């Protein structure tokens, strides 16, 4: 599959392949593109295996448009939109390997339902602690 045309909206990059099939991916997977101006987004080149934005130092493979996880899960979306949370410290606080949590966040591995619930419960616990802060 080869993407021959791309376009954007505020939250997605869209691609059309040679057969006319359209695809989309969340820009949360590509923070540099998400924050880029229209002019920066328009300055790309097609390569043999993907799309390259030299000024942004960003690449998207053609293959990635066919991935099942074009949209981040709720857990992934939380961590991708809250960069202020230190993933290594969050993982340590629940006794999880930080690399494993990063793999969950970036879509390289999928957590079990139980593990995802454990992560969610800890996020809720942190939120409750923050709500209870007084000065």
PLM feature spans:
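Motif-centric detector for short Cys/His coordination patterns
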Residues: 1-135
């Amino acid at each position: 599959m080869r993407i021959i045309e791309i376009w954007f909206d505020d939250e997605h990059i869209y691609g059309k392949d040679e057969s006319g099939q359209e695809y989309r991916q969340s820009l949360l997977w590509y923070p540099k593109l998400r924050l880029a101006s229209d002019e920066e987004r328009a300055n790309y080149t097609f390569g043999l295996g993907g799309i390259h934005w030299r000024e942004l130092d960003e690449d998207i493979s053609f293959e990635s448009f066919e991935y099942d996880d074009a949209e981040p899960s709720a857990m992934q979306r939380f961590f991708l939109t809250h960069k202020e949370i230190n993933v290594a410290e969050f993982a340590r606080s629940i006794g999880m390997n930080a690399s494993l949590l990063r793999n969950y966040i970036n879509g390289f591995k999928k957590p079990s339902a139980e593990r995802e619930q454990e992560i969610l419960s800890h996020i809720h616990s942190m939120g409750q602690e923050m709500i209870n802060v007084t000065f």
